[in-house]
Amino acid sequence: MAAKLLLLLCLFSGLHARSRRVEEDDSEDSPSNQKWVLAPKSQDTDVTLILNKLLREYDKKLRPDIGIKPTVIDVDIYVNSIGPVSSINMEYQIDIFFAQTWTDSRLRFNSTMKILTLNSNMVGLIWIPDTIFRNSKTAEAHWITTPNQLLRIWNDGKILYTLRLTINAECQLQLHNFPMDAHACPLTFSSYGYPKEEMIYRWRKNSVEAADQKSWRLYQFDFMGLRNTTEIVTTSAGDYVVMTIYFELSRRMGYFTIQTYIPCILTVVLSWVSFWIKKDATPARTTLGITTVLTMTTLSTIARKSLPRVSYVTAMDLFVTVCFLFVFAALMEYATLNYYSSCRKPTIRKKKTSLLHPDSTRWIPDRISLQAPSNYSLLDMRPPPPVMITLNNSMYWQEFEDTCVYECLDGKDCQSFFCCYEECKSGSWRRGRIHIDVSELDSYSRVFFPTSFLLFNLVYWVGYLYL
C-alpha cells in the first residue's frame, strides 16, 4: 500500500513540473528587461500569420478597387511650425504631420485584434498614394532616429499612413503695399499620376490643426489664420483633384519702422535746419544739404536689400523717394536763394548821348517831361544824376546803378517770379504775377516744407493702413 502511494506521488510531481515548463515556454522573457518586457508568443504568431496571409497574393502596384471605382483619400494635416518666410526668395518653410486614410479591401482580416500598428518597414509592402506637393521647392522626410512614419491597418481594410515632412514651399508675394502687406501662402498637393476618375482627395473633419505658435519662426509676420480649398485642375494628362491650404500672414512693421521710416523722417527734418542758417553761410548750408542727400541715398539702398528685384513701386519705395525729393528740394532752395541774392557791385555808366538823339531813351513818347539839374559847377566832378522820363505815370530809368546778376529792369517787364532788388516790386512787374521776395524765401520754406511733408505723411499712412 505504501508503495502505491509513493508511486502516485511521484507521478503527480512529474506532471506538475511538466506543466510548469510548458507555461514558461509560452512566454518570451528578455534577459536584460525581465521586469517589463513580456510578449505572448501566440499573439506574435497571429500577427505574423495575418500579415503573411494578407501579403501572399497582394500586388502593391495596383491601387485599391482598380477598374471598379475611384480610391478615396481622406486627408488631415497637423501644422507643427511655420517659418521663416523669405521675401527675397518668395518661399516659406513649414513642418507638418501629413496623414492619409483610405480603404483597401484586399487587406481585410478576421481576428480578435481590431488594429495592426506597424512600423515603416511595412510601408514599402503595400500600395501608397502617390501624393505630391505641387508648389514645393524642396521637401525632406524626417529619419532620426527612425523614419518618422506610421502605418495602421484596421480589420475592415482601412489604412492610416502618417509621416512628418519639412517643406520649402513657394509663395508668390505681392509687395505693392510692402511693408504693410498681407499674404495668403498656399500649400498645394494632389496625386501625381491618378486623375479624378481614379483617385479623389477629401478633407476630413477638423482636417487642419496647428500647434502652439510660440515655437514658430515668423519673425516678421503674424499668423492670422488658415483656410482649405478643393478644386479640379485641368491638364493635358487629365483632370486632377487639387487640395490647397492657405496660411494667412500679416507683416509686422516694427523692423522697417526702426530701420527705414524713422531715419528717413529724421533726415528730412534735418534738411530743414538750413532754413534757419544765414544765407551768407554758404559752406555750412551746402555741406548740410549734400550730407542729407547722400544719407537718403544710403537709406534707399539699404531699404531695397530686404526686397526682391521687383519692377513695380512698393509703399516703402514711394516713401523713401518722396523723402529724397524733400531733401533735394531743400538743397535746391538754397541754390536758388544764393543765385538770386548775389548782386554785383554798383557800376556808374555815363550816357554819351543826349536826350535830343533818338537813342537816348528806349523809345520816344509824344509828351516828355524832362527833369534835370539846371546848373552845374565847373569844379563839381560828381556825375549828374540819372535822367528820368515820365510817361503816363510810368517810370523809366536811363541808367541803373545797382545792376544784379539777373537784370529785371531794363525797359522790360520782369520775366521771373523772384525779386532780386527792391525796385522790382514797383510797376515794372507785370500785373497778375505772383510777387515773391527772394530775401524772404527761407521764411516761406520754414512753413511750406514742414506743412507739405506733414500732409504727405497723413495721406500716406491713412491710405496704406486704412484704405
Swiss-Prot record:
It catalyses: chloride(in) = chloride(out). It is a multi-pass membrane protein. The gene is Gabrg3. Residues 18-256, 304-311 are extracellular. It comes from Rattus norvegicus. Gamma subunit of the heteropentameric ligand-gated chloride channel gated by gamma-aminobutyric acid (GABA), a major inhibitory neurotransmitter in the brain. GABA-gated chloride channels, also named GABA(A) receptors (GABAAR), consist of five subunits arranged around a central pore and contain GABA active binding site(s) located at the alpha and beta subunit interface(s). When activated by GABA, GABAARs selectively allow the flow of chloride across the cell membrane down their electrochemical gradient. GO terms for biological process: chloride transmembrane transport; gamma-aminobutyric acid signaling pathway; inhibitory synapse assembly; response to xenobiotic stimulus; synaptic transmission, GABAergic. Residues 1-17 form the signal peptide. This is Gamma-aminobutyric acid receptor subunit gamma-3. The chain crosses the membrane at residues 257-277, 284-303, 312-332, 447-467. It holds the Pfam family Neur_chan_memb. Belongs to the ligand-gated ion channel (TC 1.A.9) family. Gamma-aminobutyric acid receptor (TC 1.A.9.5) subfamily. GABRG3 sub-subfamily.
